[in-house]
Amino acid sequence: MKLVLTQEVPGLGSPGDIVDVADGYGRNYLVPRRYAILATRGAERQVAQIKRARDARAVRDLDHAKEIAGQLSGLSVRLVSRAGKEGRLFGSVTAADVVSAVTDAGGPALDRRRVELSTPIKSLGSHTVAVHLHPEVSAKLTVQVTSA
């Protein structure tokens, strides 16, 4: 059975892909849940329209990610946290803390899932944090953790 996917289906494809699946899988799962529609001539035209829209969105997303990376490139953020005598923090600095500090410093709004901390920041000092904005674009920013 040939279907046109309308949503992302893990292991099968992305919206606009024409896939060949077993009749039962298509009829009982994909079509009723509106993950796919039957592949007809009208659906194939719709696929072409979806692909054009997806390509335009990909270009727009890449440009937006490059713009945000430019804003983050020279940004240094300062976080104040309580710490012990040896410079170890009571708790840790998380990705959400970094995002709120960037926003407070006048930087762009970020999603905390885009901020990559290899390990939580648990000490005072300067730390470099990677922000993955797009599969092709990432930026690094400096987080300065100081004692309260």
Curated annotation (Swiss-Prot):
Stored SUPFAM superfamilies: L9 N-domain-like, Ribosomal protein L9 C-domain
Keywords, comma-separated and alphabetical: Ribonucleoprotein, Ribosomal protein, RNA-binding, rRNA-binding
One Pfam family cited in the UniProt record for this chain: Ribosomal_L9_N
Source organism superkingdom: Bacteria
GO biological process terms held by the UniProt record: translation
InterPro entries for this protein: Ribosomal_bL9, Ribosomal_bL9/RNase_H1_N, Ribosomal_bL9_bac/chp, Ribosomal_bL9_C, Ribosomal_bL9_C_sf, Ribosomal_bL9_N, Ribosomal_bL9_N_sf
GO molecular function: rRNA binding; structural constituent of ribosome
Disulfide bond residue pairs: none
Keyword Cell inner membrane: no
Residues that span the membrane, as ranges: none
This protein's GO CC annotations: ribonucleoprotein complex; ribosome
Sequence similarity: Belongs to the bacterial ribosomal protein bL9 family.
NCBIfam families in the cross-refs: L9 (TIGR00158)
Function field: Binds to the 23S rRNA.
Annotated protein name in UniProt: Large ribosomal subunit protein bL9
Originating species: Parafrankia sp. (strain EAN1pec)
Lineage, highest ranks first: Bacteria, Bacillati, Actinomycetota, Actinomycetes, Frankiales
